[in-house]
């Protein structure tokens, strides 16, 4: 009985300094506990936001990766070889597919002989020079077309050109930027162009006109030229 009375007395005694009851200590403890719980809740919310953002970025990357590639340009199989023309900035070794050029009878003979010893020399050297001659003849128009297709080339002031043979009608392999054969520059072409022309004929007879890889762009070019002629 005495013990219980002494305990009751202790719980009701005021503090010496403040005059408050000991329940203040319980209130402080409750306030500290609520602050800790709020901090933990805020941390958990931040973690949830981070997880949601990470999942969102991953989903966007997956959608970009699953984007369907552009359709392959259709080419007629008339027995003549086709070559994909590439362009790059002179100071950056990164090729961009530009157009397709069809070869004539002379080009067909060169391609047929490319697997023997003499044909390798003719194929790598003479075909390259003939294609380069066709390109440099209309280089300004070719550069305009290239800048429209690849905006990254707008800042370039000097270009290099290359080509790949379309083998077995495989356009996808021909459009890849690996194993592109670089064409000689205009200065290099002038040194031996006359000899090549005398032996193999004019480059214009060996190769047809350049065709754009984007369908409909040739029609737009022709319409523009007609409008300029009428004006």
Swiss-Prot record:
Effect of inactivating the gene: No visible phenotype, when grown under normal light conditions. Partial loss of PSII capacity after high-light stress.
Extent of Basic and acidic residues compositional bias: 217-231
Ranges where the record places region Disordered: 206-231
One Pfam family linked to the record: HHL1-like
Top-level taxon in the UniProt lineage: Eukaryota
Residues annotated as transit peptide in the record: 1-39
Gene Ontology CC: chloroplast; chloroplast envelope; chloroplast thylakoid; chloroplast thylakoid membrane; mitochondrion
Record carries keyword Transit peptide: yes
GO molecular function, one term: mRNA binding
Induction cue: Not regulated at the transcription level by high light.
InterPro entries: HHL1-like (IPR045388)
Membrane protein topology class: Single-pass membrane protein
Record keywords: Chloroplast, Membrane, Plastid, Thylakoid, Transit peptide, Transmembrane, Transmembrane helix
Subcellular location: Plastid, Chloroplast thylakoid membrane
Transmembrane segments: 93-113
UniProt function note: Involved in photoprotection. Forms a complex with LQY1 that is involved in the repair and reassembly cycle of the PSII-LHCII supercomplex under high-light conditions. May function in guiding the release of psbC from PSII core monomers.
Binding partners and assembly: Interacts with psbB, psbC and LQY1, but not with psbA or psbD.
Protein name, entry field: Protein HHL1, chloroplastic
Organism listed in the record: Arabidopsis thaliana (Mouse-ear cress)
Protein's gene: HHL1
């Amino acid at each position: 009985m005495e013990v219980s009375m002494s305990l009751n007395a202790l719980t009701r005694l005021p503090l010496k300094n403040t005059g408050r009851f000991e329940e203040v200590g319980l209130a402080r403890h409750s306030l500290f506990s609520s602050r800790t719980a709020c901090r933990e809740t805020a941390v958990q919310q931040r973690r949830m936001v981070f997880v949601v953002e990470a999942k969102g970025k991953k989903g966007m990357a997956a959608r970009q990766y699953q984007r369907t590639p552009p359709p392959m340009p259709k080419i007629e199989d008339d027995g003549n070889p086709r070559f994909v023309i590439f362009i790059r900035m002179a100071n950056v070794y990164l090729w961009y597919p530009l157009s397709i050029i069809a070869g004539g009878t002379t080009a067909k003979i060169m391609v047929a002989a490319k697997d023997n010893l003499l044909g390798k020399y003719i194929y790598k050297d003479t075909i390259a020079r003939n294609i380069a001659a066709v390109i440099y003849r209309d280089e300004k128009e070719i550069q305009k077309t290239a800048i429209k297709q690849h905006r990254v080339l707008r800042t370039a002031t000097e270009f290099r050109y290359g080509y790949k043979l379309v083998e077995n009608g495989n356009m996808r392999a021909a459009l890849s930027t690996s194993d592109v054969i670089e064409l000689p520059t205009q200065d290099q072409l002038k040194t031996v162009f006359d000899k090549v022309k005398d032996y193999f004929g004019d480059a214009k007879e060996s190769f047809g006109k350049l065709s754009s890889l984007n369908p409909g762009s040739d029609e737009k070019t022709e319409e523009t030229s007609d409008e300029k002629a009428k004006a």
